[in-house]
Amino acid sequence: MASTYTPLGIELQATGENAGTWGTKTNTNLQIFEQISGGFTQQALTDGGTVALAVSDGATGAVMSHRMIEFTGTITGTSTVTIPLDVQTFYFLRNSSSGAHNVVFKYATGSGSSITFSGTQKGDKIVFATANDGTNPDIKEIPFIGAVVDDTTPQLGGQLDVNGNAIGDGTLEL
């Protein structure tokens, strides 16, 4: 049985294979794992085009195998960044591109959902590539905790159980 590769490029060595090179291959796998768990890289966007991020089976350096990807470059039209259909992971994405145009992050094919940095929106997003469908997988945005902290109109959708003192500075109606 020959070695196989995970969707993010880690080599799964077959029993008894790679005599004499096992240590080198294992070290490469550990470096790939390090990229996946916390690596940072930059990806220049193509002006109004598509950048296809690809896996490098058994090799380090694949942009899509890094945890954080920063998009750079000057764009004058919508730029799209794609990943292969079988990738299931989460990313920290940063849009540092110049130009007031959309940057779309999605799977390479299919009609699943994507995420978009709209026009002048720069900054960060946390996204989850679900690989939830063989032909139409979704990309989901995970909100930052700041969205909860900055909520000026919080609402409670159920009963509130207070185990201690309730402190307030307004009117309490029961």
Model features per residue range: what roles?
Residues 1-9, 16-103, 137:
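Exposed extracellular interaction/assembly regions and N-terminal maturation sites
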Residues 10-12, 167:
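Short clusters of hydrophobic/aromatic residues that line enzyme substrate/ligand-binding pockets
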Residues 30-39, 99-108, 113-114, 126-144:
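Short, surface-exposed terminal/edge motifs of secreted or surface/virion proteins that either
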Residues 31, 72-75, 86, 96-97, ...:
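Beta-strand repeat scaffolds of extracellular/surface proteins
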Residues 86-88, 120-124:
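Tight coil/turn sites that cap or link beta-strands
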Residues 116-118:
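Short beta-strand segments within Ig-like beta-sandwich modules, predominantly Fibronectin type-III
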